């Protein structure tokens, strides 16, 4: 069976490990690879519901429970027509290592449903969620497997899924994260991935410039227009940066003078009703007051002028090798991924070559991989689990402070492990290799201790 997305994720981890001195210094870790690459459990199930026309529909549901050595399975649910086992295995495999970098007790998993929610009524979406949870509820629990949202599963869907679980199991427990604030959710959870991405990028800037620079005055190109992109954009604007692009599946918007926080707010409210960026630009007054250019069928990378920072926040493989070259030519110095596997292997090679061959800071290009740069969402999910177990709610200041601490600790671990096990950067160490090595060692040690590997 061909599983290209999973194979790409697996080979990226293995290549980092093979290119390091880890197996030379600790040959016993090599035994972990064939074990950790196989999920502990894959659950596939039929989901049927009645649509608004009174017709029965059916779709394939999945939950990949990948690894629980570090804690309960933890990872999102994706409702999208592209959902298949290869994509969920790739996401679940990445989730194992990403979760380990948070420093919280979480394993890795991923699930979803192959369905398109666009154009469906709230009532039908509720029926879909209840039908999906009817089977999933047999396999999850607050100490077993704690799903969250992902593409196609936002606050509304989490609410329906949680209500279904509570109804089927007669139990109120922290079995899902991303819940509403008045029924067990955490403050800062919607913002967490975007904010965390910016905090990680800020740590990159601090390290590379010895604390001399920040987001202030930086030109930032962002893709996507969902939660991650919106909150990353708002945090960049708050920190004094200029956001020059956003995008969706149909095209992108470019603003050389900068997209405003008011425009981001309009995008946020309109996206709830599945409006495209093209519709939003034409319908909302904030876009007539502060002009932007809409480019149909395009990603932003080759359409922006000079940029300092690129934050892919849309979907997998959204930055090609040629687009990576264009970004480097336009002056980009920092790339950090808000999307999972946002850059193709060819694009990562372009960024990593620009880093490893640089002879001085002014030439260096630094790439922050998704398993480190975008773990803010799952980190705050872990904090939501902690709050649920204590039946308390933390303040937004405390959650934000914990998020910053987790992102900075993650960055420092990536640096430390890269320095210890790799020697390929004169100016800056590889965060790709650092993240892969650090997370692999954490998971491997837990598996050795518990007898999963012997």
UniProtKB/Swiss-Prot annotation:
Subunit structure: Homohexamer.
Function: Catalyzes the incorporation of an ammonium ion into alpha-ketoglutarate to form L-glutamate, the major route of assimilation of ammonia into an organic form in yeast.
Active site: 110
Gene3D superfamilies cross-referenced by the UniProt entry: Glutamate Dehydrogenase, chain A, domain 3, Leucine Dehydrogenase, chain A, domain 1, NAD(P)-binding Rossmann-like Domain
The entry's keywords: Acetylation, Isopeptide bond, NADP, Oxidoreductase, Ubl conjugation
Positions bound to NAD(+): 174-203
Organism: Saccharomyces cerevisiae (strain ATCC 204508 / S288c) (Baker's yeast)
PANTHER family in UniProt: NADP-SPECIFIC GLUTAMATE DEHYDROGENASE 1-RELATED
GO cellular component: cytoplasm; cytosol; nucleus
Catalysed reaction equations from the record: L-glutamate + NADP(+) + H2O = 2-oxoglutarate + NH4(+) + NADPH + H(+)
Gene Ontology biological process: glutamate biosynthetic process
UniProt modified residues of type N-acetylserine: 2
InterPro entries cross-referenced by the UniProt entry: Aminoacid_DH-like_N_sf (IPR046346), Glu/Leu/Phe/Val/Trp_DH (IPR006095), Glu/Leu/Phe/Val/Trp_DH_C (IPR006096), Glu/Leu/Phe/Val/Trp_DH_dimer (IPR006097), Glu/Leu/Phe/Val_DH_AS (IPR033524), Glu_DH (IPR014362), Glu_Leu_Phe_Val_DH (IPR050724), NAD(P)-bd_dom_sf (IPR036291)
Misc. comment: Present with 77500 molecules/cell in log phase SD medium.
Protein name per Swiss-Prot or TrEMBL: NADP-specific glutamate dehydrogenase 1
Domain of life of the organism encoding this protein: Eukaryota
């Amino acid at each position: 069976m061909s599983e290209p997305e999973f194979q790409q994720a697996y080979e990226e981890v293995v290549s980092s490990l093979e290119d390091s001195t880890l197996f030379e210094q600790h040959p016993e870790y090599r035994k972990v690879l064939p074990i950790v690459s196989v999920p502990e459990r894959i659950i596939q199930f039929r989901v049927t519901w009645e649509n608004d026309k009174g017709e029965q529909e059916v779709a394939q549901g999945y939950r990949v429970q990948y690894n629980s050595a570090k804690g309960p399975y933890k990872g999102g649910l994706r409702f999208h027509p592209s959902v298949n086992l290869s994509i969920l295995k790739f996401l679940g495999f990445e989730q194992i290592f990403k979760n380990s970098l948070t420093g919280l007790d979480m394993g890795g998993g991923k699930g979803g449903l192959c369905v398109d929610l666009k154009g469906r009524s709230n009532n039908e979406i509720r029926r879909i969620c209840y039908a999906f949870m009817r089977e999933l509820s047999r396999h999850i629990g607050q100490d077993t497997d704690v799903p969250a949202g992902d593409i196609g599963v936002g606050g509304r869907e989490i609410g329906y899924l949680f209500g279904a679980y509570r109804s089927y199991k007669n139990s109120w427990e922290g079995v899902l994260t991303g819940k509403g604030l008045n029924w067990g959710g955490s403050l800062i959870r919607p913002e967490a991935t975007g904010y965390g991405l910016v905090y990680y990028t800020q740590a990159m800037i601090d390290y590379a410039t010895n604390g001399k620079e920040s987001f202030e005055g930086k030109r930032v190109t962002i893709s996507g227009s969902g939660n991650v992109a919106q909150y990353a954009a708002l945090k960049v604007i708050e920190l004094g940066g200029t956001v020059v692009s956003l995008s969706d599946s149909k095209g992108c918007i470019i603003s050389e003078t900068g997209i405003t926080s008011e425009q981001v707010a309009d995008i946020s409210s309109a996206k709830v009703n599945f409006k495209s960026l093209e519709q939003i630009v034409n319908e909302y007054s904030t876009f007539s007051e502060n002009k932007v250019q809409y480019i149909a069928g395009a990603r932003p990378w080759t359409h922006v002028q000079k940029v300092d920072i690129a934050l892919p926040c849309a979907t997998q493989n959204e930055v090609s090798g040629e687009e990576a070259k264009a970004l480097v030519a336009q002056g980009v110095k920092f790339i950090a991924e808000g999307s999972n596997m946002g850059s193709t292997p060819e694009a990562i090679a372009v960024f990593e070559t620009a880093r490893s061959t640089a002879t001085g800071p002014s030439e260096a290009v630094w790439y922050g991989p998704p398993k480190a740069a975008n773990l803010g969402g799952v980190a705050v999910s872990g904090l939501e689990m902690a709050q649920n177990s204590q039946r308390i709610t933390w303040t937004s200041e405390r959650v934000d402070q914990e998020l910053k601490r987790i992102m900075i600790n993650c960055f420092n671990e990536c640096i430390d492990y890269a320095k210890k096990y790799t020697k390929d950067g004169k100016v800056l160490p590889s965060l790709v290799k650092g993240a892969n090595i650090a997370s692999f060692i954490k998971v491997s040690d837990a598996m050795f201790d518990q007898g999963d590997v012997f």
